[in-house]
């Protein structure tokens, strides 16, 4: 399902819509693809070849079949058509069990990541409101904030709900509903160059949190971080890696401590 939403109602999306905590966890448990919602014009697959996406999907579907075939071929040539009177055709059962165990483990970890991400989105939003951080932001910095999250979504190259929930919360906090090319990388870099020093640190803090929220760092993210962080690369990269690792490992308290957003560097 593909849907376009230029100005979605964040309250609906987070409480009863596709990115409510119930629906987020249900999709993780059932391994259902997250909905393709181009919220505020942001296209997560902007830098992804559609042919590569199709190829990766086919490879993923074929891996269990290939594993069964390889296992049967090896057993047939090493021990013959039967093992203890049992046909090697039944070898598919333990292979299926092995893959199912891996899938269950991955699903549990992903569900935990989504649950913690949802909680941390609320934690970050509450902190920003309590500290009154948004009051002194320029219009360029406000738009830059959504570009920070929007470009993190593009760099991650998926519709991970943690990032979408973060985007919706910040859209609601900033009261921005028009499309300002939030997934344009060059405009985000320009904002980092033109806003004040403190606002730049604010944007980098938010960008770091958004980039870590799917619990992994892709190659394209690692390369792009140098352009975004600039002279502060050595300061922000360790925080990004630590936050990503804490989220992936389920260390929510450690992750929460790294989710600070203010006007200081690092």
Describe the role of every protein-language-model region.
Residues 3-266:
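Small-residue-enriched hydrophobic alpha-helices in membranes
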